[in-house]
Amino acid sequence: MSVADVKKGVEQKMQRSIEAFKNDLAKIRTGRAHTGLLDHVQVDYYGSMVPISQVANLTLVDARTIGVQPWEKNMVAKVEKAIREADLGLNPATAGDLIRVPMPALTEERRRELTKVVKSEGETAKVAIRNLRRDANEALKKLVKDKEISEDDERRASDDVQKLTDKHVAEVDKLVQTKEAEIMTV
């Protein structure tokens, strides 16, 4: 393993942490409707649980309503039940074979709770990134111990890893700020 391998590996892992954080943020409801909100809803499809996107078409009807059109008529009730039980605080209404999912307006108190959740998720993501930095620095120290690189090379590589860490932590902070602004916008 070389210094380049360590740096490349840690950067890829940090990027994956950012992607996972973005996915977590997408699940947090803001006042506006977006189809990503229902991505993790699982529907009972002939005995097996499948993502809602595999049994229905998701569209935005307007800024506050998601339209869900199951591909099979007999799935309408099951899809509606799955949305209702997904613990998202949503109350779907069926009109024929179209399920309308209106987004209720968030109360001020709920907005504050959601910003706390966003901050907490952000901290978790930053801790994960810092843990990756620690792992990379330990790998570099092992390379020095095994006499594969000099201490100067290790120090330079450590500085590079720190720069990567700072960059990714700043990206998390930016995502948190953006999501908080989105939540607090009435």
UniProtKB/Swiss-Prot annotation:
Keywords recorded for this protein, A-Z: Cytoplasm, Protein biosynthesis
Pfam families: RRF
InterPro entries membership: Ribosome_recyc_fac, Ribosome_recyc_fac_dom, RRF_sf
Gene Ontology, cellular component aspect: cytosol
GO molecular function term, any single one: ribosomal large subunit binding
Record's keyword annotation contains Disulfide bond: no
Superkingdom assignment: Bacteria
Biological processes annotated in GO: cytoplasmic translational termination
Protein family: Belongs to the RRF family.
HAMAP family (UniProt xref): RRF
Its biological purpose: Responsible for the release of ribosomes from messenger RNA at the termination of protein biosynthesis. May increase the efficiency of translation by recycling ribosomes from one round of translation to another.
Name of the protein in its database record: Ribosome-recycling factor
Originating species: Burkholderia cenocepacia (strain ATCC BAA-245 / DSM 16553 / LMG 16656 / NCTC 13227 / J2315 / CF5610) (Burkholderia cepacia (strain J2315))
Name of encoding gene: frr
